[in-house]
Swiss-Prot record:
GO cellular component: membrane
Source organism: Vibrio vulnificus (strain CMCP6)
Enzyme class, UniProt record, top EC level: transferase
Transmembrane segments: none
PANTHER family in UniProt: UDP-3-O-ACYLGLUCOSAMINE N-ACYLTRANSFERASE (PTHR43378), UDP-3-O-ACYLGLUCOSAMINE N-ACYLTRANSFERASE 1, MITOCHONDRIAL-RELATED (PTHR43378:SF2)
Similarity remark: Belongs to the transferase hexapeptide repeat family. LpxD subfamily.
Listed GO MF terms: N-acyltransferase activity
Documented EC number(s): 2.3.1.191
Entry keywords, A to Z: Acyltransferase, Lipid A biosynthesis, Lipid biosynthesis, Lipid metabolism, Repeat, Transferase
Protein name: UDP-3-O-acylglucosamine N-acyltransferase
InterPro entries named in the record: Hexapep, Hexapep_transf_CS, LpxD, Trimer_LpxA-like_sf, UDP_GlcNAc_AcTrfase_non-rep
Length: 343
């Protein structure tokens, strides 16, 4: 079990400790369930009333909340960020693989860095390069001439197609497919002719990709995911999409081909983004957004109808279907009013 002293917690978070720096903690826990040996945090002031009864060894909070807590306190600028840093330090998640399994199939010319781990039944094809400390989970497939940077981890059954380039310090969850063919077809009098997808996928450093996400290879140029991007589970990123630095996408979102998404964007879950458009830096799209045209200015954008009771929704839907009729009636009324003004 990993343990940290409160002095070490203060160093990790950059916080100011009020208490015994030699006391140890071994687990992060929610405030209502924390006990001896646990560290917890207060990020929402409305829960400050519970501090008096909190049994955690130490609480991370803002300076203005310190008066509510009589035990060990770590004063930090942002308790939620401090929680993330401490959770990383106390992380007990096992590695996807440890060492090279006897059943792994590794091409003789594959280049493996120092301390590489490859799980059972993984396949590493010819020309592959794996950097130092790369971890390949059980059942993964790494295609010809692909390259994976140092410290990157792939969980079980990830598929990396030929020539895909993945940077350093990335994390890819189970079942994700990177570099499969984009949806490219030409129509010849009703017959669909497949267009070979001759580009690849380039993924930057410190990128995280959730489970069962698909990122298609480019048709001619590459599909590009820049540094520090976070992609959730079950996303579809089509061919030649370019996602900018630090952008985040929750689950279920679909991005059609050749669309460029800027830096530091936040795309809400289950959104649909049209192809061949551009989204500016700093755009925030709320959940289930349907983006059909380019967005040229940063800001918050929404579409769709928020949840209503079924009765209210049916009335709203009926009114929407009558909008054209109502518009014609309104124009007719306006015309009559204008005529009366002239008279």
């Amino acid at each position: 079990m990993m343990t940290l002293t409160l002095a070490e917690l203060a160093k990790i978070t950059g916080g100011e400790l009020h208490g015994d720096e030699t006391v140890c903690v071994s687990r992060v826990a929610p405030m209502d369930k924390a006990g001896e040996g646990d560290v917890t945090f207060l990020s929402n002031p409305k829960y400050a009333v519970h501090l008096a009864e909190c049994k955690a060894t130490v609480v991370m909070l803002k300076a203005e909340q310190r008066k509510h807590c009589s035990g060990h306190v770590l004063v930090v600028d942002d308790p939620y960020v401090a929680f993330a840093k401490v959770a990383q330090a106390l992380d007990t998640t096992p590695k996807p693989a440890d060492g090279i399994a006897p059943s792994a199939v590794i091409a003789s010319d594959a280049i493996l860095g120092q301390n590489v781990s490859i799980g059972a039944n993984a396949v590493i094809e010819t020309g592959v390069t794996l950097g130092d400390n790369v971890v390949i989970g059980a059942g993964c497939f790494i295609g010809k001439n692909a390259a994976i940077g140092q410290n990157t981890k792939l969980w079980a059954n990830v598929t990396i197609y030929h020539q895909v380039q993945i940077g350093a310090d990335c994390l890819i969850q189970a079942g994700t497919v990177i570099g499969s063919d984009g949806f490219g077809y030409a129509n010849d009098r009703g017959e669909w002719i497949k267009i070979p997808q001759l580009g690849s996928v380039r993924i930057g450093n410190r990128v995280e990709i959730g489970a069962c996400t698909t990122i298609d290879r480019g048709a001619l140029d590459d599909t590009i995911i820049e540094d520090n991007v976070v992609l959730d589970n079950q996303l579809q990123i089509a061919h030649n999409v370019h996602i900018g630095y630090g952008t985040v996408m929750p689950g279920g979102t679909v991005v059609a081909g050749s669309t460029t998404i800027g830096k530091y964007c936040a795309i809400g879950g289950a959104s649909v983004i049209n192809g061949h458009i551009t989204i500016a830096d700093g755009v925030n799209i709320t959940g289930m957004g349907m983006v059909m045209r380019s967005i040229e200015e940063k800001g918050v954008y929404s579409s769709g109808i928020p949840l209503q009771t079924n009765k209210e929704w049916r009335k709203t839907a009926a009114r929407v279907h009558r909008i054209e009729e109502m518009n014609k009636r309104l124009k007719a009324i306006e015309k009559i009013v204008e005529q009366k003004k002239e008279d």
